[in-house]
Swiss-Prot record:
EC numbers on record: 6.2.1.48
Organism expressing this protein natively: Escherichia coli (strain SMS-3-5 / SECEC)
Reactions catalysed, as given in the entry: 4-(trimethylamino)butanoate + ATP + CoA = 4-(trimethylamino)butanoyl-CoA + AMP + diphosphate; crotonobetaine + ATP + CoA = crotonobetainyl-CoA + AMP + diphosphate; (R)-carnitine + ATP + CoA = (R)-carnitinyl-CoA + AMP + diphosphate
Name of the featured protein: Crotonobetaine/carnitine--CoA ligase
Keywords from the named record: Ligase
Amino acid sequence: MDIIGGQHLRQMWDDLADVYGHKTALICESSGGVVNRYSYLELNQEINRTANLFYTLGIRKGDKVALHLDNCPEFIFCWFGLAKIGAIMVPINARLLREESAWILQNSQACLLVTSAQFYPMYQQIQQEDATQLRHICLTDVALPADDGVSSFTQLKNQQPATLCYAPPLSTDDTAEILFTSGTTSRPKGVVITHYNLRFAGYYSAWQCALRDDDVYLTVMPAFHIDCQCTAAMAAFSAGATFVLVEKYSARAFWGQVQKYRATITECIPMMIRTLMVQPPSANDQQHRLREVMFYLNLSAQEKDAFCERFGVRLLTSYGMTETIVGIIGDRPGDKRRWPSIGRAGFCYEAEIRDDHNRPLPAGEIGEICIKGVPGKTIFKEYFLNPKATAKVLEADGWLHTGDTGYRDEEGFFYFVDRRCNMIKRGGENVSCVELENIIATHPKIQDIVVVGIKDSIRDEAIKAFVVLNEGETLSEEEFFRFCEQNMAKFKVPSYLEIRKDLPRNCSGKIIRKNLK
């Protein structure tokens, strides 16, 4: 079944410009408060100019172009400008340092980079010291250094015509993007995403939020992340809605931005909810137009209830990962919700819980969450140049092994337990890190928490807790362990405590556990 009508991204943007014209498509707010607005017509013209820019620099269909940018209009221009000429975007996490960025450049085979001044010295070093295929750099925001192979993105773009000059044949099966996974436990893998994937993601995520063309979807999620691209941007554009992209999350500014732009949809991760809750309460907290807050794992019931009551919102839970493109399990529009369930399988997907022998399990039994989709259409196509890794998670008939553990109930609601790699084996018992973190997070002095397993010669693994305290608080080991003993089984109580100023996180707010082991 062809869900998207054979429409690739170039056709999508030409149609959107025709249908919605002068309606606002994109609003970008920088950390300094600078706001840029573009109508659907203007945005399509900027995309065309950017496509022409890349063509003048020698980029052709199938070439890879890396983007190392924070949230900004140029990211959107490049994303779709590359797609229009059949080239492939390789977004790089803007928080990555030299070694990690060089590794992605090498493994993606990117020949051109678009970045900003703050990252340029790092790439100068990479060009001098690392073997890459990079032959040109475009800078988005500064006067040019006196250096060969470097251009001003804005100057070159503004010299281009607003109509597309190069339009090679495109197929919805063509690769549009290679997005490298966050690599919280190992080296990142390049997830191959097609034009079909992105078009489907737009329709699917718009359905999940019941988006209309009068909606305003605001996000602070990084543009180089699958959530921003497929849950937010593609959904908003596919529905003809307005997409508001804020450069960076600020707990002090976020709720005001929701109110200022009259957002009807936004998305939050647990870190955002916890930091919003420690902001001073305001009489205007519930003065907003939000219909849904898209939510991603993981939060205790106490935290969820307090957030929803204070801000007068409801959470729409969505579960997915880069490889699934969208939230393939989640709450459905107009359907009942059952906290702490992560929802039910969405349309075009099947979901099962399987045991260690890949056999389906009945309701109530814990196993691996597995999803069935169509590679290159409703789930990712493959890992770039890594067939062994692809075969490890993706079966020939489209079943994807997520590596997450969970269970389902008799009505088809699924419940997340933990990442398999986050299960601690302690003296014959399996302990979920997420379960412990949700309990410990309810302590009134604790702002942030992660637990990890560390080697133990007697019990296989011991449990160590890393906590960040609320400002001005102190917490003794005696008080911490007493709280744990009162709220969890004895075998789950951590053996060690470390109090830190912060925890290592990636761009999507996930703890980088390998940095703590």
